[in-house]
């Protein structure tokens, strides 16, 4: 929580007011990521095969914990798709732990598909890669060959409850969030 002095309470000689300072609400940035499963090959160009809304952490210096809220808004593919998050600029040696709040049970079940390791983060390489889910349809309760289009328009099955995954990354050493925010690399994968 940031606290700012009340308007007009700052003077050249410094802040010396006895008034209670104003509380400033921290606003989180929300971005949408839309994926086409055939990229870079030609596809149907609708960019609805996986649609994620992502709430990013607030900016700041010396941050030791990053919290992301990821909503799976639509699934427009009829094949198994998973999604992951690579965070460029965070060495895995600096990661104390990655844990999950809401959506953790569905995430774990969907990782049995084999697209990603069934772990908090991938063990290969030096960069932090977090599997978000291994099967978008499984997240919404579809199994086997059941792969309907979800929440993509008139001919699809509407979603009444949107799946949300909360991802918490705890670091050993503090970092600056703006550099990490620029390094986000959301991606999709399939078998």
Predicted segments, located by residue:
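Extracellular distal adhesion/interaction modules in secreted or cell-surface proteins
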Residues: 1-191
